[in-house]
Regions:
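Sec-dependent N-terminal signal peptides
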Residues: 1-3
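Sec-dependent signal peptide cleavage junction
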Residues: 6-23
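Chitinase-like catalytic core of GlcNAc-active glycosidases
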Residues: 23-276, 285-288, 297, 301-304
């Protein structure tokens, strides 16, 4: 199921000025293959969020066929915004139109605490109000602000909530309203469910921030790096209390260069003994929603 290697991409080692002709690809029903694209390794973004000595070589023209969603993943440290801007300019003017022509949607991850909760607190305070006095109109206005800031301003189609914490009831009360407002605009409950995407990605089974708003999302992307299908089965059973199995999408990772701490070892040899084969087989056999892969440019690489 995961024979989609980077070597099968449209252009090998595309340079910044290349503009390949996009060939359309057929969809795969309700099965998804999402990849996380590490923007700081793009050929247009140099010296941002990394001290690796080797040159960036990948571009979004290199993304293989067979993928239906690209998660644009990037953290830009304070003071490095100018160095990162060429990537976002290229994303809007060239990369996004090219990938759209191939039938691919692009989303961007947002930190749950930073945007769903603390971001709203900061924004509502700037309006001279507080959480207790916030109205539905305030949540709607904040949704418009977030969508413009993180999505439409760079030509993307959706957003992805990255949940890796354990919010309390007060925080969940805020995020439920933030998510509900955003779901009016993007995702399956919006006026444009086909052209937009709203995802929930998590590495745990803490469902308090999910259960009330579960119908707002296209699917759950479950980060289970370093784990086999036993974990897939347990997590799928938890989330299937709220969503259909076809909306549960487990994910693994290729090895990130120079990472001395996170040795997930998902892509090992022999392939038939690897987590990739095991989880892909389980996803197929149990009618899950597909799979996702983090760090697609590290296919076939090692941690060195």
């Amino acid at each position: 199921m995961l024979g989609c290697s980077l070597a099968m991409g449209t252009v090998a080692n595309a340079q910044e000025g290349d503009s390949p002709v996009a060939a359309s690809q057929e969809g795969n029903g309700n099965k998804h293959f999402m990849v996380y694209y590490r923007a700081w390794r793009d050929v247009t973004m140099k010296g941002v969020n990394t001290d690796l000595p080797d040159d960036n070589w990948i571009s979004m023209y290199d993304i293989p066929y067979g993928i239906d969603v690209v998660n644009v993943f990037s953290y830009v440290p304070s003071g490095q915004e100018a160095a990162a801007q060429p990537f976002y300019d290229k994303l809007k003017s060239d990369y996004a139109p090219y990938l759209h022509a191939r039938g691919i949607k692009l989303v961007r991850g947002l930190d749950y605490s930073g945007v769903m909760v603390d971001g709203f607190k900061t924004w509502i305070a700037q309006q001279g109000k507080n959480v207790d006095s916030a109205t539905e109109s305030d949540y709607d206005a904040y949704a418009d602000h977030v969508i413009e800031t993180y999505m439409t301003s760079v030509g993307l189609d959706g957003l992805d909530i990255d949940m890796e914490t354990f919010p309390d009831a007060a925080q969940v009360a805020i995020s439920d309203q933030v998510i509900t407002a955003r779901a009016k605009r993007i995702g399956p409950k919006s006026d444009n469910p086909v052209g937009t995407t709203f995802l929930y990605d998590t590495n745990g089974s803490y469902t308090a921030p999910f259960k009330i708003v579960s119908d707002c999302f296209d699917y759950v992307a479950y980060q289970q790096y370093g784990s086999d299908s036993n974990r897939t089965a347990k997590a799928a059973a938890t989330y299937e209390q709220f969503i259909d199995s076809t909306k549960f999408v487990p994910g693994l990772t290729f090895p990130e260069e120079g990472d001395m701490n996170n040795r997930w070892n998902d892509a090992t040899e022999p392939y038939l003994d690897s987590h990739f084969y095991d989880v892909a087989s389980y996803s197929y056999d149990h009618n899950l929603g597909g799979m996702f892969v983090y760090a697609l440019d590290r296919d076939g690489r090692t941690y060195s």
